[in-house]
From Swiss-Prot:
A lipid is attached at N680 (GPI-anchor amidated asparagine). It is a lipid-anchor; GPI-anchor. This is Lysophospholipase 2. It catalyses: a 1-acyl-sn-glycero-3-phosphocholine + H2O = sn-glycerol 3-phosphocholine + a fatty acid + H(+); 1-hexadecanoyl-sn-glycero-3-phosphoethanolamine + H2O = sn-glycero-3-phosphoethanolamine + hexadecanoate + H(+); 1-hexadecanoyl-sn-glycero-3-phosphocholine + H2O = sn-glycerol 3-phosphocholine + hexadecanoate + H(+); 1-hexadecanoyl-sn-glycero-3-phospho-L-serine + H2O = sn-glycero-3-phospho-L-serine + hexadecanoate + H(+). It comes from Saccharomyces cerevisiae (strain ATCC 204508 / S288c). Present with 623 molecules/cell in log phase SD medium. The gene is PLB2. The lineage of its organism: Eukaryota, Fungi, Dikarya, Ascomycota, Saccharomycotina. Glycans are attached at residues 47, 80, 94, 125, 162, 181, 193, 217, 279, 309, 365, 390, 491, 515, 524, 543, 567, 584, 598, 630, 634, 642, 648, 652, 658. Sequentially removes both fatty acyl groups from diacylglycerophospholipids and therefore has both phospholipase A and lysophospholipase activities. However, it does not display transacylase activity. Substrate preference is phosphatidylserine > phosphatidylinositol > phosphatidylcholine > phosphatidylethanolamine. The substrate specificity is pH- and ion-dependent. In contrast with activities observed at optimum pH 3.5, the order of substrate preference at pH 5.5 is phosphatidylserine = phosphatidylethanolamine > phosphatidylcholine > phosphatidylinositol. The GPI-anchor is attached to the protein in the endoplasmic reticulum and serves to target the protein to the cell surface. There, the glucosamine-inositol phospholipid moiety is cleaved off and the GPI-modified mannoprotein is covalently attached via its lipidless GPI glycan remnant to the 1,6-beta-glucan of the outer cell wall layer.
Length: 706
């Protein structure tokens, strides 16, 4: 991989702003505001009977860019082919012959964000060396880019920073205010500079409290959203507190079709339930809409007006629509909101109780019944009439909409939005950086789960290529290199429709140990660069050193569906590629030892992650003891006894200081005395802030399970 300054990040381009243009922000901060409703009497909700008018119109602009970019990419990919006449047919005046591409980025915390960044960099012609040693131009040729959980941290960062590139992020990586500066965890961003950390968390608490004071329900996901935003939008005022999801449609690079359409995925949770499975309602967010194709909802709403009180899509009060509820950080955090799963896991329930107690201590009016999920209130689909008659109407009957991490249903790859017949894609690149095995490598289970979903109630009208069981994935080495699924359309005719060919690209080791724990919540510059470089190599078969023909094989995968539908002659080089990379239906179902038991949820691993993320104070001591010194009259000096009694944390578990790591520049810090005054004004003491930091360490470690 030849990312500029990949090993010498000290050579930087100064003064270049990566933030989105000024049109990307609305309102005055994180709290939503009230605005007049649209003047026309149209509903804010539509039946999910096809693509929205806005998406359809945007596609016309995007198609013009992808056609040119894809022609250039395929010309390079097939330059050594004996017969390239098919390209002339594909790029004739008939635009329907041009293949359409989607890219899906899996969840997996910072591992997925960084490893996925390397894979995306390999596909981006803005990356130095990507055209010579990678798949440069493939990203420019793609129509859709979906992200889930940690993968959405990647896609959201790129899209809402004015479609910045991984290359630009790398070029600025050693700067203290750079994007993805995660040398210190979001829990303690100042490291040894406690002043900096206190001020950061004062701001976060005040911003979330402002949303509550404005009359909107809040949950732990709001705190998570604001904390994450400092990693993703550091160049924007208050780290993008006023940045909205819908504002992207007003940014030129998106409005003109110069970038893919970003899609993020979250799972719905029925009111009064906690279990999420393949029958969960799958929600997608685009800059235009949010909603679900699933029969349990079958509706979409304009994302710009989320939070508005509606009945069957019509505002209850035409003079009072909500603006700013679709905060970009909140949507990104929604896709990574995994709190409810912790309350179900025996090994994490104690930490969850700690978090619940902490959050209610510092933020007033936190939802008591549903603080473990992302709350969208009022429910934008209240009383809508598009639910399939065979389904319960509980989602549309509820006053609020509850969403959780998009991977909780076992589909850790956001493939469903890309395989919809309405989007008519020919090939989907599935970038899997999950941690399913004992060694934190992907097992292919997310592919298996998406395949199985088409046979569930929620999978009505869905099609996905045949894939093997998880043991076969591992036993046949399908997770050791890219594998193509659905290579022959003639073998898929018994499905609902012919789905896209899926190019599965798993996380594999090349130059760096890319199988970092999902619980790892801080990466220094060297680690970040190593993860990105390894992702680049995983996506390119080691910069083509493992297979010099790999670029051509990717070209074959892209043109395959159109070649079949046109009944055109397949280049002979593609025949060999498909023999090398297509799964041929062979099964090997014997139990694989790599699946003996993933340790993600073990309490020891969580405690270890907390110790890395916070400064060295035992959690049990903090929970059980009174605070002292620098306190204010409004400070709560101890936690409730039921939390302490339920804790099974060892008093010997300490939270080690990581102050030796590089920290945010001290030039931004204020004196301790001025900070103490500010802390008193905000009713947050130094001692309580230490408690806050430690308990937020528990939050961070648990969130790391995505």
């Amino acid at each position: 991989m030849q990312l500029r300054n990949i090993l010498q990040a000290s050579s930087l381009i100064s003064g270049l702003s990566l933030a989105a243009d000024s049109s990307s922000t609305t309102g005055d901060g994180y709290a939503p505001s009230i605005i007049p409703c649209p003047s026309d009497d149209t509903s804010l909700v539509r039946n999910a009977s096809g693509l929205s008018t806005a998406e359809t119109d945007w596609l016309k602009k995007r198609d013009a860019y992808t056609k040119e970019a894809l022609h250039s990419f395929l010309s390079r990919a097939t330059s050594n082919f004996s017969d390239t006449s098919l390209l002339s047919t594909l790029f004739s005046s008939n635009s329907s012959n041009v293949p359409k591409i989607g890219i899906a980025c899996s969840g997996g915390g910072y591992r997925a964000m960084l490893g996925g960044a390397g894979m995306i960099a390999a596909m981006d012609n803005r990356t130095d060396g990507a055209n010579e040693h990678g798949l440069g131009g493939l990203l420019q040729s793609s129509t859709y880019l979906s992200g889930l959980s940690g993968g959405n941290w990647l896609t959201g960062t790129l899209a809402w920073n004015n479609w910045t590139s991984v290359q630009e992020i790398v070029d600025h990586m050693s700067e203290s205010d750079s994007i993805w500066n995660i040398t210190k965890s979001i829990v303690n961003p100042g490291g040894s500079n406690l002043t900096y950390t206190i001020e950061r968390w004062e701001s976060i608490v005040q911003e979330v409290q402002a949303k509550s004071d404005a009359g909107f329900n809040i949950s732990l996901s709001d705190l998570w959203a604001r904390a994450l935003s400092y990693n993703f939008f550091p160049s924007l005022p208050d780290a993008g507190s006023a940045l909205t999801w819908s504002s992207l449609r007003d940014v030129d690079v998106f409005k003109n079709g110069e970038m893919p359409l970003p899609i993020t995925v979250a799972d719905g949770r029925y009111p009064g339930t906690t279990v999420i499975n393949l029958n969960a309602t799958l929600f997608e967010f685009t800059p235009f809409e949010m909603g679900s194709w699933d029969p349990s909802l079958n509706a979409f709403t304009d994302v710009k007006y989320l939070g508005t009180n509606v009945t069957n899509g019509k505002p209850v009060n035409k003079d009072q629509c909500v603006s700013g509820y679709d905060n970009a950080g909140f949507v990104i955090a929604t896709s990574a909101s995994l709190f409810n799963e912790f309350s179900l896991e025996a090994s994490t329930s104690t930490y969850y109780k700690m978090i619940n107690s902490f959050a209610n201590k510092y933020v007033n009016n936190l939802s008591q019944d549903d603080d473990d999920i992302a709350i969208y209130a009022a429910n934008p689909f209240k009383d809508t009439e598009f639910v399939d008659r065979n389904y319960t109407s509980s989602i549309v009957d509820a006053d609020d909409l509850f969403l959780v991490d998009g991977g909780e249903d076992g589909q850790n790859l956001p493939l469903v939005p890309l395989i919809k017949k309405e989007r008519d894609l020919d090939v989907v690149f599935a970038l899997d950086i999950s941690d399913n095995t004992d060694e934190s490598w992907p097992s292919g289970v997310c592919m298996t789960n998406t395949y199985e979903r088409q046979y569930s109630k929620q999978g009505k009208g869905m099609a996905f290529p045949y894939v093997p069981d998880v043991n076969t994935f591992l036993n046949l080495g399908l997770t050791n290199k890219p594998t193509f699924f659905g290579c022959d359309a003639k073998n898929l005719t018994d499905l609902e429709y012919i789905p896209p060919l899926v190019v599965y690209i798993p996380n594999t080791k090349h130059s760096f140990n890319g199988n970092q724990s999902t619980l790892k919540m801080n990466y220094n510059v060297t680690e970040r660069l190593g993860m990105i470089r390894n992702g680049f190599e995983a996506a390119t078969m080691g910069n083509f050193t493992d297979d010099s023909n790999f670029l051509g094989c990717i070209g074959c995968a892209i043109i395959r569906r159109k070649q079949e539908s046109l009944n055109a002659t397949l280049p002979p080089e593609c025949t060999k590629c498909f023999a090398d990379y297509c799964w041929n239906g062979t099964l090997s179902t014997s139990a694989n030892p790599e699946l003996s038991g993933n340790s993600t949820y073990q309490s020891g691993a969580i405690a270890s992650a907390i110790s890395e993320a916070t400064d060295g104070i035992p959690i049990t001591a903090l929970l059980g003891s009174s605070t002292s010194g620098n306190t204010t009259s409004n400070s709560t000096t101890s936690t409730s006894s039921n939390v302490t009694s339920n804790s099974n944390s060892s008093s010997n578990t300490t939270l080690n200081s990581n102050s030796s790591s590089s920290s945010i520049s001290s030039s931004t810090a204020r004196s301790s005395s001025s900070t103490a005054n500010k802390a008193n004004a905000a009713a947050i003491s130094y001692a309580n802030t230490n408690t806050l930091m430690s308990l937020l360490g528990a939050i961070t470690a648990l969130f790391g399970l995505i």
